[in-house]
């Protein structure tokens, strides 16, 4: 197994080897997973991060709203995080966890199989696998996503303020998105796309009118792009409406495969099925925590980091008390 170790003073990586047994294995190397690993490393816990290298916010050039890191690129943020965990002896392997099994009892821990063929063992697991965004299948949306096709006004609204906004409706809930983004621009058009106007509640229509949001029925055919920038939204009837930024609502797809293999209880929400967790992220499977977007939709980077921190501190305390109780019982 190739393990990446990052020195405190360099962004270069060296490879080394390690044994396959850890106190905690963190699956996922985003903000939530790295934050959990940082706390655990500082708590002197032997910890491994398994990082498949597929952060959700890769399409975005910058991340916003994270105090002291506002405007930083997601790649730079994660590179700094990897440097920080390495200072405390945390290992990181560039690989994907493809299977996970639990022992016959809690003391037996967990076995994590990696795509590279190795298996590592842990007393506790942190699942930080996040979610994937399933975008509307309109030509141009995927290509522009994270640039001038965006989904979160708190993440990107300031950068496109006062521009001509479009909102691509995929469900009646898109009305809420159109109303929200009107805080950042007074030129907002809601393209109903696959939503019939009859599906909108009367109260929603009144709110849209009060906010000055224009409503245009008709299916969107494609985005108009010139000189590598969005210039408009083209309908199937051939009309093009000039727009500079388009808000969409991707369908979140929780990455719960490993949790399901462990038998974790999931609950259905309007945004997918997520694990049932306590306030620390502990799932229904003893010894397994879920953090960040692995435990719920809508976790911003700062929230995900907070969830990872909370889980890491909880796991350290839980391991300490478990070991002390074992001595007392003897």
Language-model features: locations:
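FAD-site-proximal beta/loop scaffold in flavoenzymes
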Residues: 7, 143-159, 252-302, 310
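Extreme N-terminal leader/targeting segments of oxidoreductases
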Residues: 1-22, 79, 88
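Glycine-rich dinucleotide-binding loop and its adjacent helix/turn
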Residues: 6, 132-179, 184
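A Rossmann-like FAD-binding core segment of flavoenzymes
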Residues: 79-114, 119-122, 185-273, 320-330
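Beta1-alpha1 glycine-rich phosphate/pyrophosphate-binding loop at the start
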Residues: 8, 22-76, 164, 173-198
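A conserved FAD-binding loop/helix module that cradles the flavin
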Residues: 37-38, 175-179, 291-330
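Residue-level detector of alpha-helix initiation sites
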Residues: 30-31, 133, 172-173, 295-296
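N-terminal glycine-rich dinucleotide-binding loop that anchors FAD/FMN and/or NAD(P) in oxidoreductases
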Residues: 42, 46, 52-54, 61-88, ...
């Amino acid at each position: 197994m190739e393990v990446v170790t990052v020195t405190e003073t360099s962004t270069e990586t060296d490879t080394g080897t390690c044994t396959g047994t850890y106190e905690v294995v963190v699956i996922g190397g985003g903000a939530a997973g790295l934050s959990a690993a940082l706390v655990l490393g500082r708590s002197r816990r032997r910890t491994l991060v398994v990082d498949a290298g597929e952060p959700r916010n890769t399409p975005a050039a910058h991340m916003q709203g994270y105090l002291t890191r506002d405007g930083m690129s997601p790649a730079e943020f994660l590179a700094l995080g990897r440097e920080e965990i390495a200072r405390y002896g945390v290992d990181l392997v560039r690989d994907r966890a493809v299977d996970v099994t639990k022992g016959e009892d809690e003391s037996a821990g967990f076995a994590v199989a990696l795509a590279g063929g190795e298996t590592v063992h842990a007393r506790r697991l942190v699942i930080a696998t996040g979610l994937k965004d399933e975008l509307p299948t309109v030509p141009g949306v995927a290509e522009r996503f994270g640039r001038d096709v965006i989904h979160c006004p708190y993440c990107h609204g300031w950068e496109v303020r006062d521009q001509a906004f479009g909102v691509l409706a995929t469900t009646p809930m898109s009305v809420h998105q159109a109303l929200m983004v009107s805080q950042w621009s007074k030129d907002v058009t809601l393209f109903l796309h696959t939503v019939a106007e009859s599906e909108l509640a009367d109260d929603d229509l009144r709110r849209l009118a009060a906010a000055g949001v224009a409503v245009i029925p008709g299916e969107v055919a494609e985005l108009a792009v010139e000189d590598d920038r969005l210039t408009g939204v083209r309908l199937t009837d051939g009309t093009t409406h000039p727009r500079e930024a388009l808000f969409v609502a991707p369908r979140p797809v929780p990455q719960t495969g490993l949790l399901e293999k462990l038998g974790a209880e999931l609950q259905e929400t309007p945004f997918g099925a997520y694990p049932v967790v306590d306030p620390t992220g502990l799932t229904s499977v003893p010894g397994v925590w879920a953090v960040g977007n692995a435990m719920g939709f809508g976790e911003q980077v700062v929230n995900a980091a907070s969830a990872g921190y909370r889980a890491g501190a909880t796991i350290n305390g839980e391991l300490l008390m478990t070991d002390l109780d074992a001595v007392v019982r003897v």
